[in-house]
């Protein structure tokens, strides 16, 4: 049933876009003879001639505006002369002290416990490949 409603909707849409009216005396499109008299372009009657433009076809692109000589390098300052730096937009910061811990309790000299003593004597490396016994 849903398919029938969809088909009916498509049919109504097609009839509406074509402009079909109920009266037979007023066709929606004039006959071809009336169109020729109205001055509409006619279709070509033979094969196209090389070099001739297509009849009635509008140009694809409009002509671009005339180009004016643009030389942005002339706007640059002379060599060795540069524009001044623009002013900074960030708010000014108060001067920073040299001491990273300016106030309050100071950190201990070395907060870490002392490291264990390390034996720097060379140790013998263990033999990772012990000799194998032959199995019989």
From Swiss-Prot:
Tissue specificity comment: Expressed in skin. Also expressed in heart and skeletal muscle.
Keywords: Secreted, Signal
Domain of life: Eukaryota
Lineage summary: Eukaryota, Metazoa, Chordata, Craniata, Vertebrata
Biased composition (Pro residues): 44-69, 84-116
Cleaved signal peptide residues: 1-22
Compartments, record wording: Secreted
Compositional bias segments (type: Basic and acidic residues): 118-136
Protein name per UniProt: Psoriasis susceptibility 1 candidate gene 2 protein
Organism (species): Homo sapiens (Human)
Gene Ontology cellular component terms for the protein in this record: extracellular region
